Structure formats: C-alpha cells, structure tokens
Amino acid sequence: MTIPNKFLAFRIHQEEKTVRPALEEITLEDLTEGEVIVKNSYSSINYKDALAATGAGKILRKFPLVGGVDVAGTVIESSDPTLKPGDKVLAACSGLSETNDGGYSEYSRLTSNAAIKIPENITPRTAMAIG
C-alpha cells in the first residue's frame, strides 16, 4: 500500500494560551517519530480526548499534536521485526496525544513498544472497543 503525500488529521495547536483544534492535511513527516507506520481504522472519543482538544486539561505536553489516546489499524511499514505489513495492531495511551501524535489521523507512526499485535481471532474494531 502506498501512503499518500497528504492525509487528514485532527490536530491540536496552542497559540499563546489558547488551544485550537483543527482538521487539516498533514504529511507523514509531520507525525512524531516511530518504527511502525499504521493505516488507522478505529479510534475512540473519551473524556481525556475532550480535555486535550479543548485545553480544559493539561493533557498535551507539546504542540501541535494529533489527538486521540488510542488507535487500531493495519501495519503498512515497520522496522521492528516482530511487526510486519498486514499485521493488525492496537495502541492505547503510550504517550498518544500527550507527547506523541494520537489516533485521530488516517495514518499513525507508532513506537514499536506502543504497537500491540491484535490476535487473529479479534478484529481491530473489537480490540478498540475493549481497549
């Protein structure tokens, strides 16, 4: 699968003391570093995400960041030998939407220790629902 040059993400910015979320086009280079590139299928919306997007809680440690503290999807590329293209993975917390870009994007770049391989008998949707 080819990764497009630009894709959509829900990104949170801070300008002076004002937090401003926006749906915008970004590139893979805009994402935080990670060994695993994932085509995202599912994320969730929870209280912590709302705090991050509104600035009501001091969730994000740096700006801008893609929101979403969890994500499930399919590995596209990986330099980690334990995760191969086509593997289904889940990442929850692990600094997502705090110090690393989160799951509200068409693609994510995850650290290999954040990406958990989903067992074959569980769909990414079910894994996301369980967390």
Could you say what each language-model-derived stretch is?
Residues 48-54:
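Cytochrome P450 core scaffold surrounding the K-helix E-X-X-R motif
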Residues 96-112:
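A structural motif shared across PLP-dependent enzymes of the aminotransferase-like
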Residues 1-7:
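Eukaryotic N-terminal low-complexity, Ser/Thr- and Lys/Arg-rich leader segments
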Residues 5, 22-24, 71:
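Short beta-strand or tight-loop elements
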Residues 120-131:
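A glycine-rich, Thr/Ser-enriched phosphate-binding loop motif common to dinucleotide/cofactor-binding enzymes
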Residues 17-23, 56-57:
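Short gly/ser/thr-rich secondary-structure transition/capping motifs
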Residues 27-45, 56-96, 114, 119-122:
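Glycine-rich beta-strand-centered segment in the early N-terminal region that forms part
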